[in-house]
Amino acid sequence: MNNFSHWNEAGRPKMVDISEKEITTRTAIARSTITLSNEVYQAIQQGGIKKGDPTQVAQIAGIMGAKKTADIIPMCHPIMLQGTDLQFDYEKIDNGYALHIQATVKCNGKTGVEMEALTAVSIAALTFYDMCKAVDKTMVIKETYLVEKTGGKSGTFTHK
């Protein structure tokens, strides 16, 4: 357990003390992909989703998810976010479409926003599924990962 910062000397969970860290500009980009059938894609394009435009609702849900990360991930610090944005890009694949969801989160703070970006894309993907499940429940939420992070003591990370 010594390699993990969220454990105290007694082996119990703790929230890491960031009080001595420098305030720096921090950004994180995360991505998630959900695959969907041609039927779901056509329903979206034709305005046939009864609950409304799933990407618009997923965008709002993703932003809300980023803002609420500290409420649902136990050891995350509450962070004053300066910006959160999501992008949605469809890609035609062999058996339907892939929707790539990307979140960019930014703050000036003492700790990074990686979890906020990952939460944003996760909540957006779940919301998209919820919005479209009446048409087809075979959608699959696939890989969710950190694309890049900048700022802080550890500097820049880029997923390869």
Curated annotation (Swiss-Prot):
The keyword Aminoacyl-tRNA synthetase does not apply. Its EC number is 4.6.1.17. GO terms for molecular function: cyclic pyranopterin monophosphate synthase activity. CDD domains: MoaC_PE (cd01420). It is an enzyme of class 4 (lyase). Substrate binds at residues 75-77, 115-116. Gene3D superfamilies: Molybdopterin cofactor biosynthesis C (MoaC) domain (3.30.70.640). It catalyses: (8S)-3',8-cyclo-7,8-dihydroguanosine 5'-triphosphate = cyclic pyranopterin phosphate + diphosphate. The active site is at 130. The keyword Isomerase does not apply. It comes from the Bacteria. One of its GO terms (biological process) is Mo-molybdopterin cofactor biosynthetic process. InterPro entries: MoaC, MoaC_bact/euk, MoaC_sf, MoCo_biosynth_MoaA/MoaC, Mopterin_CF_biosynth-C_dom. Disulfide bonds: none annotated. Pathway: Cofactor biosynthesis; molybdopterin biosynthesis. It holds the Pfam family MoaC. Keywords: Lyase, Molybdenum cofactor biosynthesis. Homohexamer; trimer of dimers. Belongs to the MoaC family. Catalyzes the conversion of (8S)-3',8-cyclo-7,8-dihydroguanosine 5'-triphosphate to cyclic pyranopterin monophosphate (cPMP). PANTHER family: MOLYBDOPTERIN COFACTOR SYNTHESIS PROTEIN A (PTHR22960). This is Cyclic pyranopterin monophosphate synthase.
